[in-house]
Amino acid sequence: MSRLNFPILLFLLCLPGLAGTVQAREFKSRYATLSYADNQVLREFNNNLRMNKKLRYSIRKKNVLTVADEVLAKVDIIIEKVQVVLDMFPGKYHIRLVVVPDSSDVARIYKKKYGKRVDHIAYYSLSEKAIYISADDASLRVLAHEIGHSVVDHYFKVRPPYNIHELMAQFAEKHVTD
């Protein structure tokens, strides 16, 4: 770094509001990039994402050291299960999973992107290949539903009609625990 740039960088770091900005944390797994603002939100999401006995057994095979590792292990297992349930195995499948504190944050993000007010606890953004989900309202079935949308989106070259998309996501949600 040149001597000229260092004072500029130091000045920018001292500006009010810049030093205290919240940085999103990101971690990647085989199928997902996990984004969240703070560890408390991630812990709540993890606690709400209760797995049944079969799915829990699969986590034991993973190298889990942190809460983020556990969440990513759960997400990868759910994705694989949804792909089996739908019998759809898209190539190059990767999504972004954005965990926010509550449904008001999901609604705020949706309003900003699409200009509509909604009361969703989660949604899948087709254009971003991203799932936005409330940590407060998270559950295995809610996440499986949104992953169902993402698997269908990645699988077909031409997107199926919305009603078909929704039926497949509901099917994934219902059968994720089979």
Q: Where are the model-predicted features located?
A:
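Bacterial N-terminal signal peptides that target proteins for export
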Residues: 1-8
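Bacterial N-terminal signal peptides
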Residues: 9-17
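Boundary at the C-terminal end of the N-terminal hydrophobic targeting segment
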Residues: 19-24
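Acidic/histidine-rich, surface-exposed loop or edge segments in extracytoplasmic proteins
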Residues: 28-66, 151
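Soluble non-cytosolic domains of exported or imported proteins
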Residues: 62-76, 134-142, 158-163
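Auxiliary, metal-adjacent structural segments of Zn-dependent hydrolase domains
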Residues: 65-127
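Active-site recognition of the HExxH zinc-binding catalytic motif
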Residues: 141-154
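Post-HExxH zinc-binding segment in Zn-dependent metallohydrolases
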Residues: 159-178
